[in-house]
């Protein structure tokens, strides 16, 4: 497990913990590693789980799919990101999401239930870890709130501008990369890809954006871009 420490140190779940404490926790929560190829599923909707995943290599998509294959992307998790925490913390809860690999990946599986009972070794860092878990769950709520804000807009144009604006503000820059390719962006915003591509072309012609693949540059009035750098 020591080889994963550089990634684990950056994870909010292990914030404020020493390397020895992290290794002790991994033992406490029965950490196990698995690796799979792109497009393989880690969790499927309809299942239940007692473990949450931590990406240590590659990236995964948290999605919802219907019987006809229509995909709604809820989030994209890279190295250091968690997924499945709410379900792992709720024994017997049935997943209404699936987690699928966007590229070849390796993850750590952690048994959250071991954190919610008294630690048999009475770890001094146990309470700190629980506080960190609460912080991780709170951050997931904020991520979902962002998505609700974007998809709640009435038009494809408004959804795009809402999303691009939020990324720009979060990164404090008018020039930025997004984590999605075009199909994934359409799935995340719950819009048709062709309609989205048409709207992106219109926004470029109007001079509001410049884009190349997943890179975007926004153009705003001088009196509204204070605090955001090009």
Regions inferred by a protein language model and the residue ranges of each:
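Phosphate-/nucleic-acid-contacting segments
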Residues: 156-230
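Cyclic-nucleotide recognition modules
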Residues: 73-131
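Short, small/polar residue-rich loop motifs at catalytic or cofactor-binding pockets
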Residues: 28-29, 47-49
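A small-molecule sensor/coupling module
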Residues: 22, 95, 113-155
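Cyclic nucleotide-binding regulatory module and flanking cytosolic helices
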Residues: 1-41, 87-90
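Glycine- and acidic-residue-biased ligand/ion/polar-headgroup-sensing regions
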Residues: 39, 50-63, 79-80
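Short phosphate-coordinating micro-motif centered on Lys-Gly-acidic
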Residues: 41-47
């Amino acid at each position: 497990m020591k080889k994963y420490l550089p990634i684990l140190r950056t994870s909010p779940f292990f914030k404020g913990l020493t390397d020895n404490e992290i290794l002790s926790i991994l033992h406490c929560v029965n950490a196990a590693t698995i690796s799979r190829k792109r497009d393989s599923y880690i969790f499927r909707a309809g299942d239940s789980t007692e473990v949450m995943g931590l990406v240590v290599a590659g990236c995964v998509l948290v999605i919802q799919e219907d019987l006809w294959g229509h995909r709604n992307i809820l989030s994209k998790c890279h190295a250091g990101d968690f997924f499945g925490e709410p379900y792992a913390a709720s024994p017997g809860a049935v997943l209404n999401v699936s987690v699928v690999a966007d590229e070849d990946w390796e993850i750590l599986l952690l048994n959250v239930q071991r954190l919610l009972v008294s630690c048999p070794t009475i770890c001094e860092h146990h309470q700190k870890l629980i506080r960190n878990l609460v912080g991780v769950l709170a951050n997931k709520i904020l991520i979902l709130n962002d998505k609700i804000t974007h998809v709640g807009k009435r038009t494809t144009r408004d959804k795009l501008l809402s999303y691009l604006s939020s990324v720009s503000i979060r990164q404090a820059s008018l020039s930025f990369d997004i984590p999605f390719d075009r199909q994934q962006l359409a799935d995340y915003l719950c819009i048709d890809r062709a309609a989205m591509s048409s709207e992106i072309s219109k926004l470029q012609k109007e001079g509001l954006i410049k884009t190349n693949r997943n890179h975007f540059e926004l153009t705003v009035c001088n009196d509204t871009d204070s605090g955001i750098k090009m």
